[in-house]
């Protein structure tokens, strides 16, 4: 009996990974990321003295298959500078420029086997870009425009770096897998009344959790 109990205790740490293989594959994902957005606006770098805007974003997704995901996300960006009013053409002095993109997307993932270390992906979909410009004289211009985005990148598994931490994430938070992500995203969003493109190109890095 003592021998049987000892064997049970020794085999217990293997129970969680073994049990996971019999569970349904994870369907939901949470993505948090940040990076640099380079607007397509003319004379952006000259007017704002910077090559881009810092962006922070998050997204939820649902996998119908491990290779096909539907999701939605949102982000925020802000930059300060001294520019002409992009929508009226008059000198504006100091200005704060804000963008808030909202995305609905489909993602195709290159998953061939369970536990794959590197997963390439491409995606795209609809984008609504909310904008706001706050000028020195107190005037505010705001609105939104619709367009589209495309993106591609890599999801790099972090599970193998610390298996004990991965097991704790599964037991405590029901997180099956954690990935480090790097991606490039291109947006084209035309404001109809002015024909200004509120889109541009973004470079992101962050974390993806599957549960």
Regions found by a protein language model. Give the residues of each.
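Predominantly the C-terminal beta-signal and adjacent terminal strand-loop region
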Residues: 155-211
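Short loop/turn motifs that connect adjacent beta-strands in outer-membrane beta-barrel proteins
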Residues: 19-28, 62-67, 111-119, 159-178
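Transmembrane beta-strands of outer-membrane beta-barrel pores
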Residues: 34-40, 74-80, 110, 126-132, ...
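Transmembrane beta-strands of outer-membrane beta-barrel proteins
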Residues: 28-32, 66-72, 100-104, 118-124, ...
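Gram-negative (and chloroplast) outer-membrane scaffold detector with strong preference
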Residues: 59-136
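Residues that define the transmembrane beta-barrel architecture of outer-membrane proteins
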Residues: 26, 50-56, 96-102, 118, ...
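Short glycine/proline- and aromatic-enriched beta-strand/turn motifs that initiate or cap beta-hairpins
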Residues: 18-63, 190-194, 200, 206-210
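Residues on the lipid-exposed face of transmembrane beta-strands in outer-membrane beta-barrel proteins
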Residues: 32-34, 58-62, 72, 104-110, ...
């Amino acid at each position: 009996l003592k021998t049987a109990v000892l064997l049970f205790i020794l085999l217990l740490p293997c129970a969680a990974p073994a049990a996971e293989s019999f569970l349904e594959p994870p369907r939901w994902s949470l993505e948090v990321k940040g990076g640099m957005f380079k607007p397509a606006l003319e004379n952006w770098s000259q007017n704002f003295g910077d090559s881009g805007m810092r962006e922070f974003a998050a997204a939820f997704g649902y996998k119908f298959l491990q290779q096909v995901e539907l999701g939605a996300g949102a982000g925020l960006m802000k930059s300060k500078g001294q520019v002409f009013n992009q929508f009226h053409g008059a000198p504006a002095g100091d200005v704060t420029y804000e963008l808030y993109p909202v995305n609905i997307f489909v993602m195709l993932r290159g998953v061939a086997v369970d536990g794959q270390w590197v997963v390439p992906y491409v995606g795209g979909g609809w984008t609504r870009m909310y904008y706001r410009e706050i000028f020195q004289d107190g005037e505010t211009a705001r609105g939104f425009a619709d367009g589209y985005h495309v993106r591609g990148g890599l999801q790099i598994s972090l599970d193998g770096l610390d298996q004990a931490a991965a097991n704790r994430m599964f037991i405590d938070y029901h997180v099956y897998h954690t990935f480090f992500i790097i991606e490039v995203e291109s947006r084209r969003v035309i404001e109809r009344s002015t024909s200004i493109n509120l889109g541009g190109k973004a470079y992101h890095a962050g974390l993806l959790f599957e549960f």
